[in-house]
A protein has these predicted regions:
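Surface-exposed loop-to-helix/strand elements on domain peripheries
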Residues: 117, 134, 338-461
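Short coil/turn segments at secondary-structure boundaries
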Residues: 142, 166-167, 291-297, 382-386, ...
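Charge-rich, acidic-biased intrinsically disordered regions
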Residues: 142-148, 164-182, 307-327, 419-455, ...
């Protein structure tokens, strides 16, 4: 860089132009470094108009959540792809319901395997007494397995939902625990903004000094709904502590979709990243459908040359009444085999829509691939379009089941297991289940509360290949019979063994051959990928 002053303080001689240009560009090289040449650039033409800001999760999510919920629900109700995506996740994650498989820590509790098995069987029997009945529901509409489906679908659609666990006595019910599902919209800020600011309430959730949720504010009705009783003429809010102050009992379960950021209070609808794509696809599909319908219409327009002429068929007397459409001065209507009379001098020119469009299917497939990538649902499963080879279809299902298993574990830890632990505490306190030390030591309580939850199996594209693969895994010690039985059929191994024993005894008593066997299997040649 050239000098501006000499050592004696006099002004230095002018530098050559190239040196001055270098001196001016030097600071720019320091500032324009690293990501400023790429994603952080404001100089590139592709980035120059992109302005973005950073803020916390509450600003990004809670301030926009009402719009996201409304649009997500509208897409679920009107867009087939959105409806299919949510129902596909719900059906594969929950299916007919996740069933309890009690698994206590027998070694820690000092129990033999036989004693533990008896205790688990009795506990599952008592659990079914409560879970299989609609009495478990606050509204007495659904059993526990149907509530799982509602929780999953509501959470996917709205971003989150809330579950309350009140104790309500009812005639004919052994247990008092009830499960109530609260839609996301009902948990919102009270009208008193000053009070909400004092207590750090946002999105209807009050947080403490460490950022922990300590209470939710529940409206007595949906804020956007019409009052249907005198009790709900005015929207009022109730503060519900998430944990009991005296016992620490869970009063509220916050079932939330993927937590994306620290200090996030509310969940985001799963369709949020693809709302625009789904809406545009819906508009395009509607336009193509209407164009195809119009191109399929056959309508005859009759032009009358002058008022004196009687027109086609002698004044229209030969036309069936159902085929005649009285002209509207504002519009004409197309119909199937319809005949429309035109006024004197009027003519009709119809543009050929050239439908169906040959590009429609390709465009829909391309957009659905993008949507499926965001939702973690392979394109084949999103559209139920399995036309590729066995290997490609199986790869798509395996990829999808990574997500289904993750969401199944999430549902278990967020909803099923906490509700089971609340029910077990009541069963022990009522003396219907014997669990020594349950309330004395948290470690003992956790040992009694151990459980696994099994749902519907994944399903198989080629049952023969899947069964042979399972046999090989078990024979070589890579897996267990219990695990393979659960993954292939959704059933527990001990249940299968007991059922088979009864079946074989029944067959023998009838004089039938109860022996099973396997036939030699010739592996089919793997299909080549298309």
């Amino acid at each position: 860089m050239s000098k501006l002053f000499e050592a004696n303080g006099t002004l230095a001689s002018p530098s050559p132009p190239q040196e001055l240009a270098t001196a001016v560009r030097a600071p720019a090289r320091v500032v324009s470094s690293g990501y400023s040449h790429g994603g952080a650039s404001y100089a590139k033409k592709s980035m120059i108009g992109w302005r973005s800001t950073t803020t916390d999760a509450d600003e990004d999510i809670v301030e926009n959540i009402e719009t996201l919920r409304a649009r997500s629900r509208m897409l679920y109700m009107t867009a087939p792809i959105a409806t299919g995506a949510l129902k596909t996740i719900r059906t594969n994650v929950v299916g007919s319901g996740l069933s309890l498989n009690s698994q206590i820590d027998a070694g820690f509790l000092g129990m033999s395997d036989e004693e533990a098995s008896d205790w688990e069987a009795n506990t599952e029997r008592e659990w079914r007494l409560w879970a299989d009945s609609v009495m478990c529901d606050v509204e007495r509409r659904q059993n526990f397995y149907q509530l799982q489906s509602l929780v999953m679908l509501s959470t996917l659609m709205s971003g989150d939902c809330f579950v309350i666990t009140p104790m309500i006595r009812r005639v004919g019910s052994v247990y008092d625990l009830r499960v109530g599902i609260i839609e996301a919209d009902r948990v919102c800020n009270p009208k008193d903004n000053l009070e909400a600011l004092k207590k750090n309430i946002l999105g209807g959730i009050e947080v403490g000094k460490y950022g922990e949720a300590i209470a939710v504010y529940v409206a007595n009705r949906h804020p956007g709904a019409t009052a249907r009783s005198t009790d709900t003429l005015e929207v009022k809010w109730s503060r519900v502590p998430i944990f009991g102050d005296r016992t620490g009992r869970r009063n509220v379960l916050h079932i939330m979709t993927d937590v994306e950021r620290p200090a996030q209070r509310r969940g985001v609808p799963i369709l949020a990243p693809v709302i625009e794509e789904l809406k545009q696809l819906k508009r395009y599909s509607d336009a193509e459908l209407m164009a195809a319908v119009i191109s399929g219409m056959f309508t005859v327009f009759v032009t009358t040359p002058s008022p004196d002429e009687s027109g086609l068929f002698g004044g229209g007397g030969g036309l069936p009444a159902m085929q005649c459409i009285d002209p509207d001065p504002q519009a004409y209507e197309l119909g199937n085999g319809a005949i429309v009379r035109l006024a004197e001098g009027e003519k009709v020119e119809i543009a050929d829509p050239k439908r169906p469009s040959v590009a429609f299917d390709g465009y829909v497939q391309a957009v659905c691939r993008h949507i499926g990538a965001a939702l973690e649902i392979p394109y084949e499963l999103l559209l139920k379009h399995f036309t590729s080879s066995y290997s490609a279809s199986r790869a798509a299902l395996l990829e999808a089941w990574k997500m289904f298993r993750m969401r199944r574990e999430w549902l278990v830890s967020s909803f099923c297991q906490p509700v089971y632990e609340e029910w077990l505490a009541e069963a022990v306190s009522k003396g219907r289940i014997n669990a020594p030390g349950f309330f004395a030591d948290p470690a003992i309580r956790a040992a009694w509360s151990g459980a696994e939850w099994h749902g519907d199996a994944q399903g198989q594209l080629d049952p023969l290949k899947e069964a042979n693969a399972a046999v090989i895994r078990v024979q070589n010690g890579f897996s267990t019979i219990s695990r393979e039985a659960a993954e292939m059929t959704g059933m527990r191994m001990d249940s299968i063994v007991r059922t088979r024993a009864r079946e074989e005894a029944l067959l023998k008593s009838a004089g039938l051959n109860a022996a099973g066997g396997t036939l030699p299997v010739e592996e089919e040649k793997e299909e080549k990928d298309e």
